[in-house]
A protein has these predicted regions:
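Conserved alpha/beta enzyme-core scaffold
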Residues: 1-497
Length: 497
């Protein structure tokens, strides 16, 4: 039977999109990131730029993307504005050189911002799917993200049907687009595996310009084996959580976990799964990543809610080959639900995220090196940290051979402040900050988390700062960062083996 939607090439699809358009793309991490059309847009940008014609787009996604989108389009100088999150080296350089305007924002806010026009008109949506039906049901692939909202609010839609993605992924999907306030009812999610929606998103068929066929898997790199620092951080986190269970502050059946991405997060999850005293647990998180696959198959992870399956090829193959097992244990949701403050608070989620640096009072910088240069973005860390039952931040105490301390007197940029950060962990130890005033917090962080080579400096800073509820010396609070910029080391005379 003939499809009601025309088959078009990626190049044809790209030709429909004019300079200056606002284009939304599927993807939450590399999972379900649009693949063919972004590459064609990059090629079109190079061609037009070669003729002296302008071609730049405003790009909005659910989170970061794979290299086919942000990296490829940035190399082609095809992006003028970007939100809400990125992890592309080339795009990062363009943002930090003010070539690209970047809106770093909480991920659960994206759908509502689209609905109410905070970003202006959405001209196009390019969405990966396994199927679109004649009546406009769109079956998404390895992430849900903000795609359901993009489909509803874009003026025109292009669907990438990816034949490499399993049609059975729809069995994990639970899609609901919230109505606008003040007409929202309580969201009846009382367990990480509760389903309240449908396995498909919806689009007006009249908006669909065509289908681009692809056959390309997600490009998710595998994580490196955890190093000694990551393992020591993981040990401290596991020991703390077990002590909380013993003290009756975490129930014996445990609480749902949220974990950020990266090697430290993977090390923590692996350590939790391996420890015989940790009961089998659930997750309510943004991303389902590699470390969780074996934990689930071993019966250590009972169920997981996420916005995406951000899995390396080998782990994705394992999931798809065992869909009868995994389909009932993983729920994929839109990011306004996976990161919803009310659900996080109701379930009592334990949030575990990584920091670039933390100051002696527990303020966390997650995004900007020396307060100036963006790395990736705040992502969902703020939503989980502010609303979790326990908020934990992790980072190494030093890096670059000791030239950088990740515990500093004052963070030059703050994403998650002292009011939300309860636990701080480095390989040196764990600082429980609950119930402590600023002076006590500072003493504990320096004592438990700072590297020995920096402890004397931090203690001296604290003792010499003028008195106040929060002691700071505004003439010296960024001395370590200035030293780093001017001398390449926070303590230029420090020599570490």
């Amino acid at each position: 039977m003939k499809s009601r939607y025309p088959l078009i090439s990626a190049e044809e699809a790209a030709s429909f999109i004019p300079h200056g358009s606002t284009v939304t793309f599927s993807g939450f991490g590399a999972a379900a990131s649009a693949k063919a059309v972004p590459k064609a847009l990059a090629a079109r940008a190079r061609e037009l730029h070669g003729r002296g014609e302008p071609f730049k787009l405003r790009v909005l996604t659910g989170a970061s993307t794979d290299e086919n989108l942000d990296e490829e389009m940035a190399r082609a100088q095809a992006i003028s504005w970007r939100a809400p999150y990125q992890s592309s080296p080339t795009l990062r350089k363009q943002i930090n050189s003010q070539e690209v305007e970047y809106v770093d924002m909480h991920l659960s806010h994206v759908p509502q911002a689209v609905i109410f026009g905070f970003f202006g008109k959405i001209d196009f949506a390019v969405i990966e799917a396994t199927e679109i039906t004649p009546d406009g049901r769109v079956y998404l692939t390895t992430s849900i993200g903000a795609s359901p909202t993009f489909l509803q609010h874009a003026q025109k839609v292009i669907i990438e049907i990816n034949h490499s993605q399993s049609p059975r992924l729809r069995e994990m999907a639970d899609i609901l687009v919230l109505p606008p306030p003040p007409h929202r009812n309580p969201i009846p999610i009382h367990h990480p595996l509760t389903k309240i929606g449908w396995p498909y998103a919806v689009v007006d068929p009249l908006k669909v310009m065509g289908i681009v066929e692809t056959n390309e898997p997600d490009h998710v790199p595998g994580f490196s084996p955890p190093d000694e620092v990551s393992q020591r951080i993981a040990h401290h986190v596991v020991r703390f959580l077990l002590d909380e269970v013993s003290a009756g502050r975490i129930p014996k059946e445990f609480l749902p976990l949220q974990s950020g991405v990266g090697n430290v997060a993977n090390a923590v999850m692996a350590s939790l799964g391996e420890h015989p005293d940790v009961p089998p647990f659930q997750m309510y998180s943004e991303v389902y990543q590699d470390a969780l696959v074996d934990l689930m198959m071993d019966g250590r992870l009972l169920g997981a809610s996420a916005a995406s399956l951000n899995l390396s090829p080998s782990c994705m193959d394992k999931v798809i080959s065992n869909m009868d097992f995994f389909a009932s244990k993983i729920v994929l949701r839109p990011q306004e639900l996976s990161n919803h403050p009310g659900i996080i608070r109701r379930l009592g989620v334990i949030a575990m995220n990584t920091a670039l640096e933390a100051d002696i009072y527990g303020n966390v910088n997650s995004t900007h090196v020396c307060g100036q240069h963006i790395m990736n973005g705040v992502g969902g860390s703020g939503e989980f940290t502010r609303n979790s039952y326990l908020s934990i931040f992790m980072c190494p105490s030093i890096s670059k051979g000791g030239r950088i301390s990740h515990i500093v007197p004052m963070c030059p940029h703050v994403d998650n402040n002292e009011h939300s950060v309860q636990i701080l962990v480095t390989e040196q130890g764990l600082a429980d900050l609950r119930g402590l005033g600023p002076a006590q917090r500072a003493q504990r962080i320096i004592e438990r988390c700072a590297h020995p080579a920096y402890k004397d400096y931090l203690l001296r800073y604290l003792q010499e700062a003028p008195l106040g509820h929060i002691r700071h010396d505004l003439s010296r609070c960024f001395e370590l960062h200035r030293n780093l910029l001017e001398h390449g080391s926070m303590l230029p005379d420090l020599k570490l083996e």
